[in-house]
Curated annotation (Swiss-Prot):
One of its GO terms (molecular function) is lytic endotransglycosylase activity. This is Endo-type membrane-bound lytic murein transglycosylase A. It catalyses: Endolytic cleavage of the (1->4)-beta-glycosidic linkage between N-acetylmuramic acid (MurNAc) and N-acetylglucosamine (GlcNAc) residues in peptidoglycan with concomitant formation of a 1,6-anhydrobond in the MurNAc residue. Keywords: Cell outer membrane, Cell wall biogenesis/degradation, Lipoprotein, Lyase, Membrane, Palmitate, Signal. GO terms for biological process: cell wall macromolecule catabolic process; cell wall organization; peptidoglycan metabolic process. Its EC number is 4.2.2.n2. It comes from the Bacteria. Murein-degrading enzyme. May play a role in recycling of muropeptides during cell elongation and/or cell division. Preferentially cleaves at a distance of more than two disaccharide units from the ends of the glycan chain. Transmembrane segments: none annotated. The lineage of its organism: Bacteria, Pseudomonadati, Pseudomonadota, Gammaproteobacteria, Enterobacterales. It is an enzyme of class 4 (lyase). Pfam families: SLT (PF01464). The keyword Lipoprotein applies. It is a lipid-anchor.
Length: 203
């Protein structure tokens, strides 16, 4: 009986460790960042327009598309910053006071895609993530929300947005990453933060 319990414990611990091992397989950011850097003039312009760090934009481009403006995912995320017309694209259109959603050709246009990606980051920062005080924690929250939705992230802290933001403000960046690794339902959420740091280090 003790042997069975010990075997069960080993399996349980192995499962827990694999859940948090978001750095495997290792990701080499060098080439994706080099390709993303070619769009830096556009990223700087969009960043200035929307109050977003151009290096954050460049890192997201490296992670999302590897700098390929024609990239299309299985879920129909399009372009350099992998925007979905029916979700983030529609949100940006609404912020601009426009109806409808962007076309595929519009999302494959580097300038339009980066501009809308920066606008969407601004929507996240000034909307559901407003009130996060630590700049690095905010950066982490932005990329996790960009990839998997702000609502999903906030609900790992509380169903009440204000309470969630308050709990986030009790954490430093490492503690926030640990919380995401332990509590976020999407395994790619902590890995996105890992890739973000790899990309920023490669610039």
């Amino acid at each position: 009986m003790k042997l069975r319990w010990f075997a069960f414990l080993i399996v349980l611990l192995a499962g827990c460790s694999s859940k948090h091992d978001y750095t495997n397989p290792p990701w080499n950011a060098k080439v994706p960042v080099q390709r993303a850097m070619q769009w830096m003039p556009i990223s700087q312009k969009a960043g200035a327009a929307w109050g977003v760090d151009p290096q954050l934009i460049t890192a997201i481009i490296a992670i999302e598309s590897g700098g390929n403006p024609n990239a299309v995912s299985k879920s129909n995320a399009i372009g350099l910053m992998q925007l979905k017309a029916s979700t983030s694209g529609r949100d940006v259109y609404r912020r601009m006071g426009w109806s409808g959603e962007p076309t595929t050709s519009e999302l494959k246009n580097p300038e339009r895609n980066i501009s809308m990606g920066a606008a969407y980051l601004n929507i996240l920062e000034t909307g559901p993530l407003a009130g996060i005080e630590d700049p690095k924690v905010l950066q982490y929250a932005l990329v996790v929300s960009y990839a998997n939705g702000a609502g999903v992230l906030l609900r790992t802290f509380s169903s009440d947005r204000k309470k969630a933001i308050s709990k986030i403000n009790d954490l430093d960046a490492d503690e926030f990453l640990d919380h995401v690794a332990r509590n976020h339902p999407a395994p790619q959420a902590p890995r996105y933060i890992y890739k973000l740091e790899q990309a920023l280090d490669a610039m």
